A protein has these predicted regions:
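N-terminal active-site segment of His-dependent metallophosphoesterases
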Residues: 1-68, 72, 373, 377
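Accessory, non-catalytic peripheral segments of nucleic-acid enzymes
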Residues: 37, 42, 251-419
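Short beta-strand segments at enzyme active-site cores
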Residues: 41-47, 79-81, 171-175
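Active-site-adjacent helix-turn-beta-strand microarchitecture at beta-sheet edges
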Residues: 80-125, 209-213, 218-281
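Residue-level detector of anion-binding/catalytic polar loops
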Residues: 41, 76, 103
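Divalent metal-coordination and catalytic microenvironments
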Residues: 8, 48, 63, 82, ...
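His/Asp/Glu-rich metal-coordinating catalytic cores
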Residues: 55, 72, 84-221
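Short, surface-exposed connector motifs at secondary-structure boundaries
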Residues: 71-79, 291-293
C-alpha cells in the first residue's frame, strides 16, 4: 500500500503579516497532483489542519476544496486534529463525510477503533490518535498519570489491544500529533510541555508498522518506522534550511520495514537570515542570492542605525523582520532581553525571576512543583478554550503558554508565599 504522509498545513496562517493562502492553495494543488500521478492508495494527515481554533473563512473554503478533490479521486484520506485545531469544530460532520472516504478522527475515545483499508497484501488498520492534552484526557483514557507519555501510552495500549484481535498479517499505521524524543524543533511550533516534559519516547509506538507523526515542522526520521512529514511551508525563519516535503510510504508485508521516499513541496519564496552591521549587509556581494528571498535581518551595530528597514528594503525588497542585537559580551548587563532569554523555557524563566526578586534564593522543591502546576493550568485552560471555542475571537490565536505562563507561575508561588 502506497501512503502519502503529510501534516501541519496550518491553513489560514500568515508569515510576518504576509498572507500564505496562495502558497497553501499551491500546496493543495501539489498534493492532489501527487496523489493522482504517484498512484497513492491512502493519504494520512497528522494534525494541525488549521492554524487557529476559529480559522478564517478563506482557510475553511480551502480545506473544503481539498476534501472535495481528494474524495473525487476516490483515494481514502485519514486525518486527525492537532494542538492548533479545535477538535470539536474539525470533527463536525465526520460521520457523514466518512461515506466519501474522508475519515476525520478527532475524539480520543476512538483511538482504538481503526479505519480499515485493503490492498493486494490484505488489510491495513489506520489508527487516528488526535492531539491528547494530558489534563483533559487522562481520565477518559485511564492513564496512570497526566503526562504526555502516560496518555499517549494509554492510547497506544488501546491500539495494540485492537490490533491483537485482527487477522494475522494485518498491517498497522498510527497517526499521532506529539513531540517524540529526538525530534528537532523550530520556532513555529507551540510548546506543549507538561510537568516539565514535552516529549515522549519513541518506544511508545512499538508494535505498529508505521507511525505518521505531526507537530514538528521539519521533515525528519526518528526511526525507520517513525517519521515526521513536517509542514509543507516554512512558518518561521528558524525553518530557513528546511526541505519542505511529504513522505511517500510503501508498506510491504506485516513486520517488514516500510520503504519511504521524500516528495518535495513547492517553495513560494526562499527564506534567509542575515546578520551583521548594516553597512556590511548592504555591501556584501555574497548576499546577492538573498535579494529575492523573505529576509530576517539581525543588526549588530553598537548604535541603532537611522531608518534601517527602509535602507535594507532598497536591497532586499522582501525583508520582513528586523532584529537589533548589538554585539556585547554575554555578561554585559546591557545585553538584550532576547539574548538573555534565548533558549530558556517558561519554567526556567519563572524560576530565575523568583531567584532574582529574592536576592538569589531560587524556588525550593515545593515551589518548583507549584510553578509546574501553574504552567500546566494555563496550558489546560488555553486548550480547553480551543476545544470548546470559548474565549477565542475569530481571527485571533490562543496565546502560547510562553506569553503568560511564566507570569502565572510566579504569581502562584507569590500567592503561596503570602499564605
Amino acid at each position: 500500500m502506497r501512503i502519502l504522509h503529510t501534516s501541519d498545513w496550518h491553513l489560514g496562517r500568515s508569515f510576518h503579516r504576509v498572507s500564505l493562502l496562495a502558497a497553501q492553495r499551491e500546496f493543495i494543488d501539489h498534493l492532489v497532483t501527487t496523489v493522482r500521478e504517484r498512484s497513492i492508495d491512502a493519504v494520512a494527515v497528522a494534525g494541525d489542519i488549521y492554524d487557529r481554533a476559529v480559522p478564517p473563512l478563506a482557510a475553511v473554503e480551502l480545506f473544503d476544496d481539498a476534501l472535495h478533490r481528494l474524495a473525487d479521486l476516490g483515494v481514502p484520506t485519514v486525518m486527525i486534529s492537532g494542538n492548533h485545531d479545535s477538535a470539536r469544530r474539525l470533527g463536525v460532520g465526520a460521520g457523514l463525510i466518512d461515506r466519501a472516504g474522508i475519515h476525520l478522527r478527532t475524539d480520543p475515545a476512538g483511538c482504538g477503533t481503526p479505519v480499515v483499508l485493503s490492498d493486494h497484501g490484505g488489510e491495513v488498520a489506520f489508527y487516528g490518535l488526535p492531539y491528547l492534552e494530558p489534563g483533559l484526557v487522562r481520565e477518559e483514557l485511564g492513564a496512570p498519570a497526566a503526562g504526555h507519555t502516560a496518555v499517549l501510552g494509554a492510547a497506544m495500549d488501546r491500539v495494540r489491544a485492537d490490533l491483537a484481535t485482527r487477522p494475522p498479517g494485518t498491517r498497522s499505521v498510527v497517526l499521532a500529533h506529539a513531540f517524540v524524543t529526538g525530534g528537532a524543533v523550530s520556532d513555529s511550533e507551540r510548546d506543549i510541555t507538561v510537568g516539565g516534559v514535552a516529549s515522549v519516547p519513541a518506544e511508545v509506538f512499538d508494535g505498529v508498522d508505521y507511525a505518521a507523526l505531526g507537530h514538528l515542522h521539519g521533515c525528519q526520521t526518528i526511526t525507520e518506522r517513525i517519521r515526521y512529514s513536517g509542514s509543507p511551508l516554512a512558518y518561521s525563519f528558524s525553518e530557513a534550511a528546511h526541505r519542505k516535503s511529504m513522505w511517500l510510504v510503501e508498506l510491504g508485508a506485516a513486520g517488514e520495514a516500510p520503504s519511504c521516499e521524500r516528495v518535495e513541496c513547492p517553495v513560494p519564496r526562499p527564506l534567509a537570515r542575515i546578520r551583521g552591521r548594516i553597512e556590511e549587509l548592504l555591501a556584501d556581494p555574497d548576499l546577492e542570492r538573498h535579494e529575492e528571498a523573505w529576509v530576517e535581518a539581525t543588526l549588530t551595530d553598537a548604535v541603532r542605525p537611522h531608518e534601517p528597514m527602509a535602507r535594507l528594503a532598497r536591497r532586499f525588497p522582501h525583508v520582513l523582520t528586523l532584529v537589533f542585537d548589538p554585539e556585547r559580551p554575554p555578561e554585559d548587563p546591557l545585553a538584550s532581553y532576547a539574548q538573555r532569554l534565548r533558549g530558556r523555557s517558561d519554567r526556567q524563566i519563572a524560576e530565575d525571576f523568583v531567584a532574582h526578586v529574592r536576592g538569589g534564593r531560587g524556588p525550593d522543591e515545593r515551589e518548583r512543583a507549584l510553578l509546574g502546576d501553574a504552567l500546566e493550568a494555563v496550558r489546560s485552560e488555553a486548550h480547553e478554550g480551543v476545544v470548546a471555542g470559548e474565549g477565542v475571537v475569530p481571527g485571533e490565536d490562543v496565546a502560547p503558554v510562553g506569553e503568560n505562563g511564566a507570569g502565572a507561575a510566579v504569581g502562584a508561588v507569590a500567592g503561596e508565599a503570602e499564605r
